[in-house]
């Protein structure tokens, strides 16, 4: 696994996979840099290909401050290390 750091300003439009760009993993507080585990991007790409539908990342990398502002978020969340993402698959309902 390779954890990489990206600049939102410089690398935001960069494709990590055919369907995911760096900016989609950005912390919602707009901070820079963004950390993304390459394996996470590849896994999300595989999910998108499996369902054949767009996948929207609702939470990717989080700074410690942003993570602390989320009710119920673990202080040891893998989001802090670019190893987790919350997402939804368009058109797919979760039972």
Predicted regions and their residues:
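Cell-envelope/glycan interface and biosynthesis
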Residues: 2-95
């Amino acid at each position: 696994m390779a954890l990489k750091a990206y600049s939102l300003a410089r690398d935001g439009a960069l494709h990590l996979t055919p369907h995911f760009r760096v900016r989609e993993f950005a912390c919602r507080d707009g901070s820079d840099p963004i950390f993304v585990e390459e394996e996470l991007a590849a896994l999300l790409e595989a999910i998108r290909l499996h369902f054949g539908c767009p996948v929207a990342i609702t939470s990717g990398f989080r700074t410690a401050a942003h993570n602390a502002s989320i009710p119920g978020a673990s202080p040891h969340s893998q989001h802090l290390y670019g190893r987790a993402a919350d997402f939804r698959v368009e058109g797919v309902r979760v039972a």
